[in-house]
A protein has these predicted regions:
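Catalytic cores of Mg2+-dependent Asp-rich isoprenoid enzymes
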Residues: 1-136, 142, 146-228
Length: 228
């Protein structure tokens, strides 16, 4: 799932939509049931074709590449994003936090970095953007545990599950070991709070009109974390 930011100032709304459309379509391919791996791979190939200067009738990709060039996105960010989406097509568990962090960098942190470029925010806020993207994505994982089980995916590190005596995140395991399950979820929420605090350190670098939008989104996810 992708983090959404409400109340975007109108002057950059079009560009945010172009960014969001590109990300959402890639995400939809890998999250559909059954998963459309072939559709995703074609989408990825088309992106690299357009990036190399070829024309395409895929407006979403064409608009995104133009935006990327206009706002000077680092192409490595898009590589990382597509790599993480591809991980979703072939990976259903993560051994440890390092492995998960690779996924989170491409699926969430780089989106924050692209948003900073679109909002023309000082690079001092890059660290904040990465951690905010990561924190929001992580709360999505916690909120969507049930949904991800249907997709046969567990994003939480196997090492962490083991340390709470859980053999996996299954409905059966949650029913059999409710205390351990609850303690595990609490521990993951603490990790979210840590990343969220790190993100908030850079809010001061975001222009005031943008800060309201980012803070609203951040607060929505914070509220979700407290409700879980």
């Amino acid at each position: 799932g992708l983090a959404k930011i409400p109340n975007i100032p109108s002057k950059i709304r079009k560009e945010v939509t172009q960014l969001y459309n590109f990300v959402r379509i890639a995400d939809d391919y890998v999250d559909s049931v059954p998963q459309d791996t072939e559709g995703f791979m074609k989408f990825k190939e088309e992106y690299y074709r357009v990036l190399s200067g070829k024309s395409s009738d895929n407006e979403v990709i064409t608009d995104f590449v133009k935006l990327s060039q206009k706002r000077k996105f680092d192409n490595k960010w898009v590589d990382a994003f597509l790599f993480s989406m591809e991980m979703d097509t072939r990976k259903s568990t993560y051994k440890n936090l390092d492995e998960l962090n690779t996924y989170l960098y491409g699926s969430a942190e780089v989106i924050g970095l692209m948003m900073n470029k679109v909002m023309n925010v000082n690079q001092n806020a890059d660290d904040s953007a990465r951690y905010l993207g990561k924190a929001m994505q992580f709360i999505n994982f916690i909120r969507d545990i049930d949904e991800d089980l249907d997709l046969k995916r567990t994003y939480f590190p196997v090492e962490d599950l083991d340390s709470f005596g859980l053999s996996g995140l299954t409905r059966g395991e949650a029913r059999r070991k409710p205390k351990q399950f609850k303690a595990f979820v609490r521990s993951q929420i603490q990790l979210y709070f840590k990343w969220q605090k790190r993100a908030e350190l850079g809010f001061k670098f975001i222009p005031k009109n943008m800060r309201i939008a980012v803070k609203t989104a951040s607060d929505m996810y914070l509220w979700t974390a407290k409700e879980i």
